[in-house]
């Protein structure tokens, strides 16, 4: 799987255009409300996504946040849209009305009623939902990103109609931390969203990458580390990033989904730098130094391709199984396109060297979901 990081300049326009033509489904606690916008235009690339009979074969159900988040949701949706358009398959997007299990279950049921043959869900909020519904809908194939079906307090159990894709976020974070220190930054910040496993892995890797570079360059690094308990833009996130920049932090790894916009706004005001997350976010703000990315688009398109090649059901290598993608599989990394490469001292040759080391597993990187990594030259500043 090659690096297929998304260029964000055209993403929002394409997505918003698709949503005009697709069925936009919103859910309420009392039932389902469908909103159809019938506006169409000539020569539309998303034309094949429109269903003549009101059914949609591929269903995407997002988690918390907006679809056009320039990251996690948007990257996955781009993969779905690209594959479906190329293969003339109908597809639709369903957003739960609120952040509750009931709303997410209602989204799954709506997608099923609308003819979904495969339902793609994102993130930990769907663990319990799919754990209960994988057996209720045995003929529907489920693709879970960044999560596995798991009932409360129990181990994950995957039915044969479920396939899960996880990522080694610690490796992406490692690359970002290493690059930031090699670039010359000595005062870093990590501002995570909710304290969940993928975010923890990003943070742990960021610390370890900064430590490795600091040891090589014999530098002392300070790193503020905190979670904000949200993936949405907020005044609180903006205020926290303002405090950090004013306190001397030079670059913040904004590992908090849509809330990264709040960090970028502050960085623009205070001449700070930001490290984006999940996808190439260089087009979102000129303050984005780089982005610790996951190849969500490539992972989704490859999974769909394999599914349809096998007649619309998961193959033996996928059915009831989980794969984890890292540098070895080229599933994580920093964007290398010219317009996204904003380093002055850290070169692409430096990047390729450290990336090869990860692929060959020359460095042992801890996931960091249990304990914080130990450091000598990176001095962590945690909230009291």
Where are these regions (language model features)?
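N-terminal amphipathic/basic-hydrophobic helices that include classical n-h-c signal peptides
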Residues: 1-6, 33-36
């Amino acid at each position: 799987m090659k690096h297929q990081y998304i260029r964000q300049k055209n993403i929002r326009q394409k997505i918003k255009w698709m949503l005009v033509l697709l069925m936009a489904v919103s859910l309420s606690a009392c039932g389902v409300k469908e909103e159809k916008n019938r506006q169409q235009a000539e020569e539309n690339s998303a034309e094949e996504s429109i269903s003549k009979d009101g059914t949609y074969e591929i269903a995407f159900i997002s988690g918390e946040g907006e679809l056009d988040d320039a990251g996690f949701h948007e990257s996955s949706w781009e993969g779905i849209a690209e594959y479906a358009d190329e293969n003339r398959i109908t597809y639709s997007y369903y957003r739960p009305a609120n952040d509750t299990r009931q709303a997410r279950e209602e989204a799954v049921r709506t997608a099923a009623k609308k003819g979904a043959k495969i339902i793609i869900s994102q993130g930990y909020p769907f663990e319990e939902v799919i754990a209960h519904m994988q057996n209720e809908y045995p003929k529907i194939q489920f693709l879970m990103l960044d999560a596995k079906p798991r009932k409360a307090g129990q181990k994950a159990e995957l039915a044969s109609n479920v396939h899960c894709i996880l990522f080694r976020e610690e490796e992406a974070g490692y690359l970002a931390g290493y690059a930031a220190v090699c670039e010359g930054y000595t005062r870093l910040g990590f501002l995570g969203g909710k304290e969940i496993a993928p975010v923890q892995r990003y943070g742990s890797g960021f610390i370890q990458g900064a430590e490795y570079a600091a040891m090589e360059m014999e530098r002392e690094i300070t790193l503020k580390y905190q979670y904000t308990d949200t993936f949405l833009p907020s005044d609180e996130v903006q205020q926290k990033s303002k405090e950090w920049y004013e306190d001397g932090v030079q670059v913040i790894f904004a590992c908090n989904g849509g809330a990264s916009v709040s960090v970028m706004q502050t960085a623009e005001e205070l001449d700070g730098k930001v490290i984006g997350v999940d996808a190439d976010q260089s087009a979102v703000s000129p303050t984005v130094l780089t982005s610790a990315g996951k190849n969500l688009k490539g992972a989704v398109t490859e999974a769909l391709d394999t599914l349809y090649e096998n007649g619309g059901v998961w193959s033996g290598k996928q059915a009831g199984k989980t794969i984890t993608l890292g540098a070895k599989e080229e599933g994580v990394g920093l964007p290398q396109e010219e317009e996204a490469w904003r380093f002055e001292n850290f070169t692409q040759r430096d990047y390729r060297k450290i990336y090869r080391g990860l692929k060959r597993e020359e460095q042992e990187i801890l996931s960091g979901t249990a304990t914080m990594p130990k450091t000598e030259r990176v001095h962590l500043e945690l909230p009291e």
